[in-house]
Amino acid sequence: SQGVSKSEITLGSIQDLSGPLAGFGKQLRMGMQLRVDEVNEQGGVNGRKLNLKFEDSGYDPKRAVLAAQKLVNQDKIFAMVGHIGTAANVATFPVLFPKNVINFYPLTGAREMFEQPNQRLKYAFSVPYYDQARTGTPRLVKEKGAKKACAIYQDDEFGLEVLRGAEDGLKTIGMELAEKTSYKRGATDFSSQVAKMKAAGCDFVVLGTVIRETIGTIAESRKTGFSPTFLGTTAAYTDLVHKLGGKAMDGLYATMAVQVPYLDEASQPIRFWANKYKTKFNEDP
């Protein structure tokens, strides 16, 4: 298999280091590099050191394909690790799989990350966005006593997964979306979408959004006096949301697939890891 020699295993990772998820992409790159350094300090994997190469997609599927072509054909990676973005991952599959390159633990909860075809080369860890929205939406709607559930979603494979999950979840409690509205990937103005949901009288909004767009949607809503309950997925929330969005983000709910490493309340193993991260990079994870 390519990417494996007697002394080294070459891995690749495509992150968003210049687009709407750049802050998160930087954290992901540093976190993965920290773990690779730990493994190498302990002698590697079966005596082989890990060599992790990063490329930047800017959260653009076309750039992701170019990055994958470089990593697969030039750098000869054994596996793609932690590639971020649903559409970006799907776009790179035709580059990876003909060369038997594994797609390992992508940073997306799309079902395409583990379903056929080529499922033997797909290793996913996240609860699917569809199931996050399908289970989380009816539970929180009932808990909040919401009467008009609505959705704003990114107009791509990721956003549609969240939308479908929300719709199917609401069916289980005899409801349907009162309104839905979408935005193009990379958008920064959400005034028309917020106005549409406000006019519909939505008191509950499912967010098929990523980090920057989560902040933008909620900030615009607060500015116009629109204050429904907001529910996002794992893609909608990291601690960057409240760090960058401030008090306006109070009251946001999100489904999570892993424990967020808050230093003051995480489990002991996570606190241990988080403190190592802070020591190495001089910032909270």
Question: How would you label these PLM feature ranges?
Answer:
Residues 1-33, 55-62, 84-85, 152-160, ...:
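Extracytoplasmic "Venus flytrap"
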Residues 1-13, 41-50, 141-147:
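Immediate post-signal peptide segment of exported/extracytoplasmic ligand-binding proteins
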Residues 62, 76-181, 229-254:
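Extracytoplasmic ligand/sensor domains, especially the bilobed periplasmic-binding protein
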